[in-house]
Amino acid sequence: MKIGFVSLGCCKNLVDSEQIMSMIKRGGHEIVANPKDAQAIIVNTCGFIESAKEESINTIFKMAKYKERNLVKLIVCGCLAQRYTDTLREEIPEIDAVIPIREYDTLASQLQKLLGSDTLLDKAERVITGNPWQAYVKISDGCSNRCAYCAIPLIRGDQKSRTIEDIMEEVNYLASVGVKELTLIAQDTTKYGLDNYGKLMLPELLRQVSKVEGLHWIRVLYMYPDEIVDDVLQAMSESEKIVPYFDIPMQHANNRLLKLMNRRGPKEDVLKVVDKIHTMFPNATLRTTMIVGFPTETEEEFEELVDFIKEIKWDRMGAFTYSKEEDTPAYDMDGQIDEEIQNERLARLMAVQEEISKEKNQEKIGRVIEVLVEEKEGLVDRYRGRSAADAPDEVDGQVIFTSDEPLELGSFVKVKITDAKSYDVYGTCVSE
């Protein structure tokens, strides 16, 4: 059977999609790029915030249109399927099956029945849907933190860490098929292992992953500030493969709001962690995520956030307006902020960060940096790639450069930076 697949949402959901596609291919089915050629369509949805839910619903309706012309089966899974299982089944009759996340332990058998496979759909080798030299590895699922604004624990449950042995089996396979950049992900990577080993095991995992031959860059995303302990930093410093990239979602800088968000620790603790990182890794890249317009946020508290951004000068920052998510503690809080004020604050915050980013990038002019070559622009001698300071999938900026010699995509080269914009830098490939 020909199967169309649509994956929405974050990189953690993408890993789920790649694993589902692996099972489908093992069952003898073919993944097709164009839904019009499909006999069944699977939509792996996101349901994290309102805009993601809207995108998921719109995609489901778009895929449902193919049922008008063909006898297409429409299967919906993922976060939206978990959060609104009954609603989807009742209100969108075009859907043939809704498979919530917490039924993924029976996913293989459900797909086998729906798709009519004669082959057992069990754990299979990973499909990589993006560039073959880059892959994500999800080290745990769910989250045991209870941030007041976040629906992830409602959707995916408490943290469930994989064993190191299971992770290493996947890592070794990915390295064997040519993956050079490995990105470890979870809702909270620094809490990895606490649920099944009884202690924080990220340092041990990093030490084992760094021994795998073929890997060139190892990156860790989603690190909770108070869990970036000395052993984590020590493990990262022990291997040149582990890039000094620290993704620390902080959410705000006002201690009253941090407490209201149910975030652990005041901003002063984050300052101490940042100082420690810079001491051990002078060339570290620091990234964070902020929320503006959380209930009761005053103008003065927002300005405190702006001042904090100016003080830290994060290399990278993503920011979002607060999204009111039902069944979360923040949903019924007094002092909900008007959308217009939220958007205005977001624009002001990102304008400040844009200037900081531009300043940081301009400091790179004249330097020679290592770049992973990812794209060639047409027939010209211009390429696009990323440095160790840039996370995959356009999360951060790019390095745009020229080369006198043709370059192999997926290779690493040296680039001298000659110009810089707010988010991208420009340069010329130089010989080793």
What are these regions (language model features)?
Residues K36-D37, E68, S144, A253, ...:
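Short strand-connecting beta-turns/loops that link adjacent beta-strands
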Residues G47-F48, R156, N196-K199, K259-G265, ...:
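Short glycine-enriched, charge-decorated loop/helix-capping segments at active-site entrances
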